């Protein structure tokens, strides 16, 4: 693709089937995204677990099947009970990539700032692998002190 992208990820299914079909038919690989869809979070009532009732879970399974039928090469499954993540994974032959969808999905993804501990609030499904907030704060304080005390920039950080 001209911009250097290798695929697009589209959130949601319902009402967008023709768009997805057209994009896939145009030769652009599409990854679907179901469950919690951050771009529509306000329509979903905020950052809340999706698929908690049997009816909601069944709907998510149907959405995953529709995405597969439309030609999506994979589907992100976000913020659903682990049992629902497993059901979706069993229901489709395309890879499922979980983010807060339990251990049974085919792959996993985390938001980098959650993984690195940059934000003070971490979603329940994320694990911090470092205290990035402290490291960033320390680096910013050191930078400010170096500028204030004329230790930055030096000739080494300047063009001649």
Kindly label every feature range from the protein language model.
Residues 1-130, 134-160:
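Alpha/beta enzyme core
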């Amino acid at each position: 693709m001209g911009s250097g992208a290798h695929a697009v990820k589209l959130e949601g299914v319902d009402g967008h089937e023709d768009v997805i079909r057209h994009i896939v038919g145009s030769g652009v690989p599409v990854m679907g995204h179901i469950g919690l869809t951050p771009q529509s979070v306000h329509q979903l009532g905020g950052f809340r677990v999706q698929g908690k009732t049997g009816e909601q879970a069944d709907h998510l399974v149907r959405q995953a099947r529709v995405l597969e039928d439309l030609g999506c090469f994979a589907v992100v499954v976000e913020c659903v009970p682990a049992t629902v993540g497993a059901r979706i994974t069993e229901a489709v032959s395309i890879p499922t990539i979980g983010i807060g969808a339990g251990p049974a999905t085919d792959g996993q993804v985390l938001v980098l700032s959650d993984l690195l501990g940059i934000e003070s609030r971490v979603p329940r499904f994320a694990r911090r692998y470092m205290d990035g907030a402290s490291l960033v704060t320390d680096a910013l304080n050191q930078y400010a002190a170096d500028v204030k005390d004329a230790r930055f920039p030096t000739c080494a950080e300047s063009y001649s």
